[in-house]
Amino acid sequence: MANIHIVIPARLKSTRLPNKMLADIAGKPMIQRVYEQVTKSKFDSIIIATDSQKIKDIAKSFGAKVVLTRDDHQSGTDRIAEAVTKLGFADEDIVVNVQGDEPLIPIENIEQAAQLLIDKSEAVVSTLCEKITDVEDIYNPNNVKVVFDKNNYALYFSRASIPFERGFSEKEQINISEFFRHIGIYAYRVAFLKHYAELTVSPIEKYEALEQLKVLYNGYKIAIEQSAKSTPAGVDTLQDLEKVRKLFNV
């Protein structure tokens, strides 16, 4: 039986909120909050993959297993792929990518992503989404939208509003069609991760700045379904950080 692992990619030099992995949340760095949240799951191992000696030292201090990776990776998936190779995981194993800036991610969603990949044998990656209910979220490029087929395989991810119903105003769109926000959690087959770095980088991946488009561009399938629980947005800005701090201080 395949083992299931959680890997948390943690980059120190984030662009929008520098050093956010070490940002204080109710007396603990954010990376520790994320780690403590995922330890509530029952997977085989939990690893932090980072390019920072500082993050590694802090993570070791609270008992985490850490893999130090290169600092030139273009995405969290690239970082995880290196970590998986170093750790020697078996090809049949599954790795769940939990973002290091999501301290409030529901455990149910982590487990759901892993189970979805187990159930969808044609997919090499699985992920989750949730229905958009606020029209402003449709047009916010920070909210990645996704469309998928009747068998729950992703067709496309975009920062633009997809789908678009021609002939209706922006405000009317949400009443005409369903829109889904992509939730940035992924489960991967280890065999796929081991050759991920060899895949062709696609123009659309660069245009949209969405790493998952590399998977689709190279002809692989991504399974997707609506999340069991609503997932709070990750911490990308100072405003996001303040919201999370308030929730932990309640």
Curated annotation (Swiss-Prot):
Keywords: Cytoplasm, Lipopolysaccharide biosynthesis, Nucleotidyltransferase, Transferase. Signal peptide: none annotated. Its EC number is 2.7.7.38. Belongs to the KdsB family. GO terms for molecular function: 3-deoxy-manno-octulosonate cytidylyltransferase activity. The keyword Cytoplasm applies. Pathway: Nucleotide-sugar biosynthesis; CMP-3-deoxy-D-manno-octulosonate biosynthesis; CMP-3-deoxy-D-manno-octulosonate from 3-deoxy-D-manno-octulosonate and CTP: step 1/1; Bacterial outer membrane biogenesis; lipopolysaccharide biosynthesis. This is 3-deoxy-manno-octulosonate cytidylyltransferase. It is found in: Cytoplasm. GO terms for biological process: CMP-keto-3-deoxy-D-manno-octulosonic acid biosynthetic process; lipopolysaccharide biosynthetic process. It catalyses: 3-deoxy-alpha-D-manno-oct-2-ulosonate + CTP = CMP-3-deoxy-beta-D-manno-octulosonate + diphosphate. It is an enzyme of class 2 (transferase). Pfam families: CTP_transf_3 (PF02348). It comes from the Bacteria. One of its GO terms (cellular component) is cytosol. Activates KDO (a required 8-carbon sugar) for incorporation into bacterial lipopolysaccharide in Gram-negative bacteria.
